[in-house]
C-alpha cells in the first residue's frame, strides 16, 4: 500500500547563532500519526532535509489524542554538525536529505531541533 498522507512536522527554519554560541530549541506543531486516522497502522516515514545545520533533529511521538508537554517521547534523533570531523556521520548529516521509517502505533508526532546553532532545516515531513 502506498503512502497517501504527507504532513509538515517542521517547516523551513533558518538560524545563524552569529558565532557566539547562542543555541535554541525549535518545536514543530503536533500532527496526527498513522494510528490517529487509520487505527492499527504502525508505519510512518519521516523525511528530513538540511543545509549546513548544527543541531539535533528529534522526532517525538505521543499516545495521547491531545498531547501535553509530558506526553512526548523520543523515537528518532539525527545529530548534525557542520563543524564535525571530516567524513563523520554528524558532518554528513549537516547537508543531507534523509528518511527513516518509524514503527509504532502512535497517535501524534512532532519534530524538534535541539541545540540549534546554525543552518537551514528545509523541511521535516511525516508520511503514512
Tell me the role of every PLM-derived stretch.
Residues 7-8, 15, 27, 56, ...:
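Serine/threonine-rich, low-complexity intrinsically disordered segments
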Residues 26-29, 33-41, 74-128:
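Beta-sandwich interaction modules
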Residues 44, 57, 109:
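Residue-level detector of short, conserved catalytic/binding motifs and their immediate flanks
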Residues 51-55, 116-117:
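Short proline/glycine-enriched turn/loop motifs at strand-loop junctions of beta-rich domains
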Amino acid at each position: 500500500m502506498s503512502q497517501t498522507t504527507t504532513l509538515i512536522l517542521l517547516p523551513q527554519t533558518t538560524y545563524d547563532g552569529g558565532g557566539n554560541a547562542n543555541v535554541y530549541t525549535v518545536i514543530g506543531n503536533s500532527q496526527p500519526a498513522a494510528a490517529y486516522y487509520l487505527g492499527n497502522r504502525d508505519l510512518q516515514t519521516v523525511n528530513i532535509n538540511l543545509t549546513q545545520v548544527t543541531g539535533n533533529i528529534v522526532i517525538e511521538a505521543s499516545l495521547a489524542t491531545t498531547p501535553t508537554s509530558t506526553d512526548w517521547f523520543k523515537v528518532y534523533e539525527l545529530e548534525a554538525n557542520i563543524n564535525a570531523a571530516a567524513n563523520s556521520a554528524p558532518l554528513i548529516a549537516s547537508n543531507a536529505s534523509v528518511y527513516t521509517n518509524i514503527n509504532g502505533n502512535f497517535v501524534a508526532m512532532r519534530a524538534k531541533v535541539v541545540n540549534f546553532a546554525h543552518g537551514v532545516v528545509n523541511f521535516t515531513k511525516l508520511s503514512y
